[in-house]
Every structure is written in structure tokens, then in C-alpha cells.
């Protein structure tokens, strides 16, 4: 597929301004420390506005009141989003209690947002609280380093509670990969943790002085679950086990979902299989993929800079051979693996270690005390008594992990009393949205605030057609950057303008096919009318066990995307 249009290894031309910024930043320091003391604005100025992203933060404002503040001649209400580095989504109950307190005491919204990258975010951190949040995280063994911008982001790992030993091994590799690919600059420690400046020169042996051309995402996957949506990621290690023990990984490279509306040089792409590698080569291969993308990725056009575009430009075999050369290995043929699903199994599951795991459905990952459903308080009370850990899933849910039989009833009572185990439909469990309005500066349409009521309407359609217990993997993302992973859904809505979305159909339940645009720039009533007709047909005409996405392809309703670089827009 990728050998059709091999191009230059390096794209020549004028570098993007982001490259200048990184080069001049003194290894990500900029003037952030000085800017922190500027009380005349609630935001960060100049390059610092972008540099703080390398430190795990985005500058945002409340878009619900932006126009009102402008009328009053006030600057936007600037506040930061902070995203924690949490490989595999594992967090101790001590850490949870600390983040709960910070959210309550020091953020505008008072909530904790679980993300589909297995971590948590704080929204609404005022500038005066930015340094304290980093220091709070450090005090409990956490940080926000490299969770945004042109680095290897938070490393995902399947939250599989059944295969306890395999999960433990895979999780250790997720942590090792995360640590190995971290930036070496001391900027984070100097600015946020008040560590002394050292006379030595900074070096970045893996990432380089200008870091990566674009964001880079990595996963460790344990089949048959594809809960982490490997095809949304640049580099994926698929666990291969023998007799229940991890022996190596299949490597898949070049997935990614972000596009730009109308820009046919951009496309969503599934990851390509490179081959199998024994465990001992994991870090060398991870480094080789990252450094190849570092050196060959497009630094002249950020919209064409991700690994998926590099792979298409130079050709899969060329990229693979370079990874082999740098890692000093030859990939073995891909070992057999298959995926059967990617949803979370809500409720109690017993692990092979005889401990119990309770997966709680958290709609859109937003942890807050709602009227009659004090979710945030409930999780805090569980954290106070639970001796195990919490695991954040890539479906924005939360697992109370490793609960001994003796504690099970007590934890279930707390969960039920706080509305954490309320019954929800299969459709709601399989629906997801990004944050979007009011805090995301890129949002074009509502997502998190739109999805709950939209799901109600889709549930009504399923009931109308006699299949109330069925589900369709449904995702809403507020803009084409695609944080809601709509480009791997059976029904994907991509925000185009307030109240308007592009409707994508034809993905599948296991997340291995990109959905094609079916209708463009349509309103909610139009979307529901289309879904009513198509779900009605699915209910009547489907084959045994056939998911909605597979049905739309088989019935000729939508053409499957087979070669995204060439047929995503056709």
C-alpha cells in the first residue's frame, strides 16, 4: 500500500515557525519562569503560550463568556488545562486523594476529567495555581511532562483485568517505554520544582534539540481487547504471549486520526504491521521508530508532519528497514493475533489472582458531584478505604482494581450509594466524546455536552426498531483534530460548526477500519433521520452477529476505506 508513491526521506523547505520556537527555547525553558510572575495577564505570552504544552498544559479560556468579556473590554478568562503523565492509566488511591483535593480547591470547574488516553486532566487552573499543581503532582510521585506537543505522549496499555499477570508485565513495559522516551531537559524540574540550574549542557539524545516534528502516540495492547484503539496511534506494541507469559510484541506503526476539513493532504490512517520482536529489543525498537520519525518527519508543514504521512511519503519498506538498521534487528514475521472488542466490561470481574476488579461507567469521563449522583465524593470515599489501585481506561471509565473478597461488599455499597453503579444501556456504554466547548479553543461544535441527550435519541431509535439491547460504537469529536476518536467509530460525528457535524459511517466494532464521510455539515435532526432509516434497515436485514458498521459496508450504504492515503476523501 505504502510503496506506491515513495518520496524524499527529508522534506526540504522553509521550516515551520514551531521549529524556530523549539530551537530558540533553550530546551523548552523559554521565558516561562518570568511569565509566571506577570500579574497583568492571566495567560502566557508569545512563545510561552505554546511552550507550556511541553510541560503538559494548554492555555484555554471559557468560550461561553468570551464575547461577554470582550464587550466589557476584558481579556478572555484564561485558565490552563493540565494533563498528567500516567502510563497505562494506573494511579494509587493516595495519588487520587491528592488530585481530588486539588480539583476541589484550585480549579474553576472543580472536576476531574478522565481522558481516552488513560489519564486525567484538570480544567480551569488559574495562572497563580499553575506552579502549585506541578508541585502537588511531584509530591505524590506524578508529573505532567511530555503529555502534549511534539513528544511521545502518555503511553497507553490495555486495562485488562482478567489476565492479571499479563497485564502486570505489559504495564511494566508501558512504563519503561514512557520513561525511555521522556525528554532529558531539566527545564521542567527547574521551572516547576525549583530545582537548581546545573552548569552542564542539556542534551536530548533521542528527541533532539527541536524534539519531534509533531505529536507522537504509543500503546501497548493485549489482544483480544483493542480498548486502547491502537489504530489511532503512531507506534503500537501488540503483546504476544505463550502459556500466559509475555514473550514479545508485534509492532504496528503509522496510525493517526486527525485531519483538516477539506484538506485532502490530510487523512485518518490505520497503523501498518512491521513485524514481531522479542521482548529484549523493545526499547531499542521504540527508540528507532521515534528517531526515524524525528529525522524524516516533515518540519515544513505541521499538517503533514505525523508519522502516518512520513510512512506514506518514504514507503513502508523504507521506513521499516531504517528502523531495523537503527535498532540492530530484523523483524520476524507478524505472529497471529485477533481483536474481538474494545469496550469495557462494566461491573465486577474476577481476575486470575482471585482479586476482584470493578469497572465503573463514567459518562464522558467527567468526575463531578452531580445532583443526586455525587460521583466525585463516592470515588474519594472508595480511595480512602481501598488498598489496591485505580485504573483509568481508554474508554474514559475507571476500574477499582485488585479488590480482595473481604472488601468487595463495602466498596460496592459505597459505589451504589454515590450513583457510580447506576444501570446504563449498552449504547451509552459504547458512546464517547471529547471535551470540546466551553474550554477547548479548537472546538467547532459541542461534543461532551451534546452526547448524553443525543444518546437518548439514538437509544429511542434502537427501541423503535425492536433492538433496545443492541449497541453501535458511537463517537463525537468537536473538531477534526479527532480527540474523540470518531474516525474509528461505527457512527462518527465530527464537528463542523455550531450545531453541525460531518457524519461518518462504516467503521467496525473492533476499531480496525476508518469510517467514510456519509453526509457533510448536517444538523442533529438530519443526523437522526439518517440513523433512523439505517438502523431500521440494520435491524431487519443484518446477518447473525453483524455490527452496524459492517452492515453499512456489506449493504453498499457506504464504501469501506481500504487505502486511506488515496481513498479517504474519494
Swiss-Prot record:
Record-level GO BP terms: cysteine biosynthetic process; hydrogen sulfide biosynthetic process; sulfate assimilation
Superkingdom of the source species: Bacteria
Matches recorded under InterPro entries: CysI, NiRdtase/SiRdtase_haem-b_fer, Nit/Sulf_reduc_fer-like_dom_sf, NO2/SO3_Rdtase_4Fe4S_dom, NO2/SO3_Rdtase_4Fe4S_prot, NO2/SO3_Rdtase_4Fe4S_sf, NO2/SO3_Rdtase_FeS/sirohaem_BS
A Pfam entry, by short name: NIR_SIR
Reaction(s) the record says it catalyses: hydrogen sulfide + 3 NADP(+) + 3 H2O = sulfite + 3 NADPH + 4 H(+)
Cofactor, free-text remark: Binds 1 siroheme per subunit. Binds 1 [4Fe-4S] cluster per subunit.
Record-listed E.C. numbers: 1.8.1.2
Pathway entry: Sulfur metabolism; hydrogen sulfide biosynthesis; hydrogen sulfide from sulfite (NADPH route): step 1/1
Co-factor(s): siroheme; [4Fe-4S] cluster
GO molecular function: 4 iron, 4 sulfur cluster binding; heme binding; metal ion binding; NADP binding; sulfite reductase (ferredoxin) activity; sulfite reductase (NADPH) activity
Binding positions ([4Fe-4S] cluster): 434, 440, 479, 483
Residues that coordinate or bind siroheme: 483
Entry-linked Gene3D superfamilies: Sulfite Reductase Hemoprotein, domain 1
Protein keywords: 4Fe-4S, Amino-acid biosynthesis, Cysteine biosynthesis, Heme, Iron, Iron-sulfur, Metal-binding, NADP, Oxidoreductase
Disulfide bonds: none
GO cellular component labels: sulfite reductase complex (NADPH)
Family from the record: Belongs to the nitrite and sulfite reductase 4Fe-4S domain family.
Function in brief: Component of the sulfite reductase complex that catalyzes the 6-electron reduction of sulfite to sulfide. This is one of several activities required for the biosynthesis of L-cysteine from sulfate.
Assembly, per entry: Alpha(8)-beta(8). The alpha component is a flavoprotein, the beta component is a hemoprotein.
Name recorded for this polypeptide: Sulfite reductase [NADPH] hemoprotein beta-component
Provenance organism: Salmonella gallinarum (strain 287/91 / NCTC 13346)
Amino acid at each position: 500500500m505504502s510503496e506506491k508513491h515513495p518520496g524524499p526521506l527529508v522534506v526540504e523547505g522553509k521550516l515551520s515557525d514551531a521549529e524556530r520556537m523549539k530551537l530558540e527555547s533553550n530546551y523548552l525553558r523559554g521565558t516561562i519562569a518570568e511569565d509566571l510572575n506577570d500579574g497583568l495577564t492571566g495567560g502566557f505570552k508569545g512563545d510561552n503560550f505554546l511552550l507550556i504544552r511541553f510541560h503538559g498544559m494548554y492555555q484555554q479560556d471559557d468560550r461561553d463568556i468570551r464575547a461577554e468579556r470582550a464587550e466589557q473590554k476584558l481579556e478572555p478568562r484564561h485558565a490552563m488545562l493540565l494533563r498528567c503523565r500516567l502510563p497505562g492509566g494506573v494511579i494509587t488511591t493516595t495519588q487520587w486523594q491528592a488530585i481530588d483535593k486539588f480539583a476541589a480547591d484550585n480549579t474553576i470547574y472543580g472536576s476531574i476529567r478522565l481522558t481516552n488516553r488513560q489519564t486525567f486532566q484538570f480544567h480551569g487552573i488559574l495562572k497563580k495555581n499553575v506552579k502549585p499543581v506541578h508541585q502537588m503532582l511531584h509530591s505524590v510521585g506524578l508529573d505532567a511532562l511530555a503529555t502534549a506537543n511534539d513528544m511521545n505522549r502518555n503511553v497507553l496499555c490495555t486495562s485488562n483485568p482478567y489476565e492479571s499477570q499479563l497485564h502486570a508485565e505489559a504495564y511494566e513495559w508501558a512504563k519503561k517505554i514512557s520513561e525511555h522516551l521522556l525528554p532529558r531537559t531539566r527545564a521542567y524540574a527547574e521551572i516547576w520544582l525549583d530545582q537548581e540550574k546545573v552548569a552542564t549542557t542539556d542534551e536530548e539524545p533521542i528527541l533532539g534539540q527541536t524534539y519531534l516534528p509533531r505529536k507522537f502516540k504509543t500503546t501497548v495492547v493485549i489482544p483480544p481487547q483493542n480498548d486502547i484503539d491502537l489504530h489511532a496511534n503512531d507506534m503500537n506494541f501488540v503483546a504476544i504471549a505463550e502459556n500466559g507469559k509475555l514473550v514479545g510484541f508485534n509492532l504496528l506503526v503509522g496510525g493517526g486520526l486527525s485531519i483538516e476539513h477539506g484538506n485532502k493532504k490530510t487523512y485518518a490512517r490505520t497503523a501498518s504491521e512491521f513485524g514481531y520482536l522479542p521482548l529484549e529489543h523493545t526499547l531499542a525498537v521504540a527508540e528507532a521508530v521515534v528517531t526515524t520519525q524525528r529525522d524524516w518527519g516533515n518540519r515544513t508543514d505541521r499538517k503533514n508532519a505525523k508519522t502516518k504521512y512520513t510512512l506514506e511519503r518514504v514507503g513502508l519498506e523504507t521506513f521499516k528497514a531504517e528502523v531495523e538498521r537503527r535498532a540492530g534487528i530484523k523483524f520476524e514475521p507478524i505472529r497471529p493475533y485477533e481483536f474481538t472488542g474494545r469496550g469495557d466490561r462494566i461491573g465486577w470481574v474476577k481476575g486470575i489472582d482471585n482479586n476482584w476488579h470493578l469497572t465503573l461507567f463514567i459518562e464522558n469521563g467527567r468526575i463531578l458531584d452531580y445532583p443526586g449522583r455525587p460521583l466525585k465524593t463516592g470515588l474519594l470515599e472508595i480511595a480512602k478505604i481501598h488498598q489496591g489501585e485505580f485504573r483509568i481506561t481508554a474508554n474514559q471509565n475507571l476500574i477499582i482494581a485488585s479488590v480482595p473478597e473481604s472488601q468487595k461488599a463495602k466498596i460496592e455499597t459505597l459505589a451504589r450509594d454515590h450513583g457510580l453503579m447506576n444501570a446504563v444501556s449498552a449504547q451509552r456504554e459504547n458512546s464517547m466524546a471529547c471535551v470540546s466547548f466551553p474550554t477547548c479553543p479548537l472546538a467547532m461544535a459541542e461534543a461532551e455536552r451534546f452526547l448524553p441527550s443525543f444518546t437518548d435519541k439514538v437509544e429511542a431509535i434502537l427501541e423503535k426498531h425492536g433492538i433496545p439491547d443492541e449497541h453501535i460504537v458511537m463517537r463525537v469529536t468537536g473538531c477534526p483534530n479527532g480527540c474523540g476518536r470518531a474516525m474509528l467509530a461505527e457512527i462518527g460525528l465530527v464537528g463542523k460548526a455550531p450545531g453541525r457535524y460531518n457524519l461518518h459511517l462504516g467503521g467496525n466494532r473492533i476499531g480496525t477500519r476508518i469510517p467514510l464521510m456519509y453526509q457533510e455539515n448536517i444538523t442533529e435532526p438530519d443526523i437522526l433521520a439518517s440513523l433512523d432509516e439505517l438502523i431500521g434497515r440494520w435491524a431487519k436485514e443484518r446477518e447473525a452477529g453483524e455490527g452496524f458498521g459492517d452492515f453499512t459496508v456489506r449493504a453498499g450504504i457506504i464504501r469501506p476505506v481500504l487505502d486511506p492515503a488515496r481513498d479517504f476523501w474519494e
